[in-house]
Amino acid sequence: MKNNMRVILAKKRLKVADVARETGLSKSTLTALYYERAKNPTFETLQKVADFLEVTIADLLKVG
């Protein structure tokens, strides 16, 4: 799944480990999302990441 997680984390100077620690999501789940290997992340996972990063799910996901 294409997403903007890498760009957003870079802008906020955060690491996957920071997101994992603050959201309670596993580092492996977030790493798969970061490297765009996550095939079907749940809505809950996307919402937790988006909430922590203070963006919408639409902002997190690449459209087009």
Question: Where in the sequence are the language-model features?
Answer:
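Short, Lys/Arg-enriched C-terminal cap helix and immediately downstream tail that follows
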Residues: 8, 42-43
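DNA major-groove recognition helix of helix-turn-helix/homeodomain DNA-binding modules
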Residues: 44-59
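A short, Lys/Arg-rich alpha-helix, primarily the initiator
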Residues: 1-17
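The alpha-helix within a helix-turn-helix
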Residues: 9, 20, 50
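DNA major-groove recognition helix of helix-turn-helix
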Residues: 9, 34, 53, 61-64
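Recognition helix of helix-turn-helix/homeodomain-like DNA-binding domains
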Residues: 25-40
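Key DNA-contact positions within bacterial/archaeal DNA-binding proteins
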Residues: 17, 28, 58
